[in-house]
Amino acid sequence: MRLVPLLLALSLSTSLSAAERETRIPEAALATAATLREQALADDTGWKVVESLTTEIGPRLAGSEADARAVAWAQAKFKALGFDKVWIEPVTFPKWERRSESAAILGAHAQPLTITALGGSPGGIVEAEVVRFPTLAALEAAPEGSLQGKIAFVDYQMQSARDGSDYRNGSAIRGKGPSAALRTGASGFLMRSAGTDNHRVAHTGITRFDEGLTPIPAASLTIPDADQLARLAALGPVKLRMALDTGWNGEATSHNVIGEITGREKPEEVVLIGAHLDSWDLGTGAIDDGAGIGITMAAGHLIGQLQQAPKRTIRVVAFANEEQG
């Protein structure tokens, strides 16, 4: 809800001459923003929006049936929240699907492992020896052809931080690791889940393969399973079987959903905020980005409840296909 004061100030403010090189927000606008902020902090609209989306729709992978239901849900929610105008814009994109995935250690220490395919990974079955690397840089430094027919495993352990700053390293492994593995001749790619948790649900996200490379199966191991694989690798060579039934399947069309509070004096000038409506398919997407949908819809709703409409138009967009786009 902390977006509300800034939105209101932007929609109500006037600027001084260019020579003064500064913008002054009128006291009346600041007072209204402060009042609105207190209302927002005491209001549960955002919470109810997130609860509704995650309960009634749940996971909503771009291009899926649930994604289509989410679009209809968002249109209805904007209207219920009192937005003046509600409309949709079509968005067409390649459609990636996850059907099944599994992995297992073979041989004397045979046991199952819990994985999830990375978004954009092709399907396939790989049975090969695992070669462990502590970091992405170590994999990138491996000589060309040195992992011919093997599975590259990047076992980078993210560090917990209040600002989540180490996530950029985890996401870099997801984004760049499969292509780095391909350059070494690897037949498959595994990474330790990008997170600092201890449950057996692996983190997913989009990966991309560099132009000119033939994609290989790529997956994320849960942190407990990555620990287990690392311990086994310390004992000696480990052979693993990874089977993914995933891949691109034509095109799909989803929609951006837009709700608008019309400005009273300068409706053609628009203050735009937004969040993405789609999520990955393994959870309800409450944080990524259900919370953003709740915050932005609620902000627009509360501004729309003011006795005086904002000077400029407030436009809230629930964007399609952010996760894979």
Language-model features and meaning:
Residues 40, 54-61, 74, 78-85, ...:
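Sec/Tat-exported extracytoplasmic proteins
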Residues 29-32, 45-50, 57, 66-74, ...:
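Stable alpha-helical elements in mature extracytoplasmic
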Residues 2-15:
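Bacterial N-terminal signal peptides
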Residues 30-32, 106-144, 207-286, 298-301, ...:
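Soluble metallo-hydrolase cores and metallopeptidase-like ectodomains found primarily
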Residues 64, 114-217, 284, 288, ...:
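Extracellular/luminal Protease-associated
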Residues 21-31, 35, 51, 55-163:
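Noncatalytic luminal/extracellular "stalk/propeptide" segments of secretory-pathway proteins
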Residues 49-54, 87-88, 130-132, 151-155, ...:
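Structural recognition of the beta-strand scaffold that forms the well-ordered cores
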Residues 157-159, 195-196, 277-279, 317-324:
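Acidic, glycine-rich active-site loops and adjacent beta-strand->loop/helix elements
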